[in-house]
Amino acid sequence: MHEVRAGLETVALNQAMDKATEEQIRDLHHHLEEMFEAAKDGDEKFFMESDIKFHETIVDMADTTDLKKFWNMCNIRLWTAVCTKRSEKELQALAEFHVPVYEALVNKDSEHAYKTMREHFHNVSQYK
């Protein structure tokens, strides 16, 4: 599932670079800040919701109906919950894995985006 989701979100990230509005970029940053806030508070549930919103915002930025359908078929809520609960990483580290993804989008660096998204999913899939 990691590879499928990584592929979908890499495509979404690259498309989002050309289509994202300033409001969507602010929303994405807000979700990133929420992840750090949840990590600081040790609030795993809020962290997972913010994580899902972060990734969903990227998919929405791509503005592709079929991509969103496939993404929804991946059962993101369950997948995020399993990965978060089983991860050997602290919530703070999981939040930090999202920063390069955000930066790649803001900087419109498609080459870095591909590498960043692959690394992101590799990092979050490391289990106890």
Question: Where are these predicted regions, by residue range?
Answer:
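A general structural signal for well-ordered alpha-helical segments in protein cores
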Residues: 1, 5, 9, 25-28, ...
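Hydrophobic, amphipathic alpha-helical faces that serve as interaction scaffolds
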Residues: 4-20, 52-88
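C-terminal all-alpha effector/ligand-binding and dimerization domain
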Residues: 10, 29-36, 41, 53, ...
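Residue-level recognition of alpha-helical structural elements
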Residues: 21-24, 40-47, 63, 67, ...
